[in-house]
Amino acid sequence: MTVMIKKIARKKCIHVMLVYTGGCNACDIEVVNAIFSPFYDAEQYNVFLTFNPREADILVVTGCVTKVVAESLRKIYEKIPEPKAVVAVGACALMGGVYKNIGGDLGTSDFVAGPVENIIPVDVKVPGCAPRPEDIIAGIVKALPKVIEGK
C-alpha cells in the first residue's frame, strides 16, 4: 500500500533531501537557491525540499564526507525508499575538494572519510566550487528517470 501511494505521489512531485557532510556551505546555498529562489523556482515544477528521508526521492549531498558524519549519511541513504537517486554536488562531494589533502601529501586525514561515492552509491555528479544553480537543477533532472521509472 505504501509503495503504491509513493508511486502516485512521485507522479505529482519530487522530494529532494539536502545533506551537508562538511565544507564551506557554498554548495548548500546554491542548492537552496536552485529550489527556492524566485529566479529558478523549482517548486513550480513540483520539486520540493524535504528533511525527512522517508519522504525523499533524491538525496543531494554536498561537502566532503567527514568521518564523524559518514555513518549518519549511510543511515539516511538506507531510510530513503526505493527507487532513489543520489546527486553529489560540488568539488568536495566529488573528490574531497580543499579538504582532501588535509593530512598532507604523505599522510591521510584523520577527519575526512573521502568523497560521497566512497560511502554511498552516487548516480549523478555535479562538479564545481560551487556549481551554478542551473547545473544543480540539471543534475536533479538527470536523476529523475531512475526515481520515476526505477531505471
UniProtKB/Swiss-Prot annotation:
<dbReference type="InterPro" id="IPR052375">
    <property type="entry name" value="Complex_I_20kDa-like"/>
</dbReference>
<dbReference type="Pfam" id="PF01058">
    <property type="entry name" value="Oxidored_q6"/>
</dbReference>
<feature type="binding site">
    <location>
        <position position="24"/>
    </location>
    <ligand>
        <name>[4Fe-4S] cluster</name>
    </ligand>
</feature>
<dbReference type="GO" id="GO:0051539">
    <property type="term" value="F:4 iron, 4 sulfur cluster binding"/>
</dbReference>
<protein>
    <recommendedName>
        <fullName>Uncharacterized protein MJ1363</fullName>
    </recommendedName>
</protein>
<dbReference type="GO" id="GO:0046872">
    <property type="term" value="F:metal ion binding"/>
</dbReference>
<comment type="similarity">
    <text>Belongs to the complex I 20 kDa subunit family.</text>
</comment>
<feature type="binding site">
    <location>
        <position position="27"/>
    </location>
    <ligand>
        <name>[4Fe-4S] cluster</name>
    </ligand>
</feature>
<keyword id="KW-0408">Iron</keyword>
<feature type="binding site">
    <location>
        <position position="92"/>
    </location>
    <ligand>
        <name>[4Fe-4S] cluster</name>
    </ligand>
</feature>
<feature type="binding site">
    <location>
        <position position="129"/>
    </location>
    <ligand>
        <name>[4Fe-4S] cluster</name>
    </ligand>
</feature>
<keyword id="KW-0479">Metal-binding</keyword>
<keyword id="KW-0004">4Fe-4S</keyword>
<keyword id="KW-0411">Iron-sulfur</keyword>
<dbReference type="InterPro" id="IPR006137">
    <property type="entry name" value="NADH_UbQ_OxRdtase-like_20kDa"/>
</dbReference>
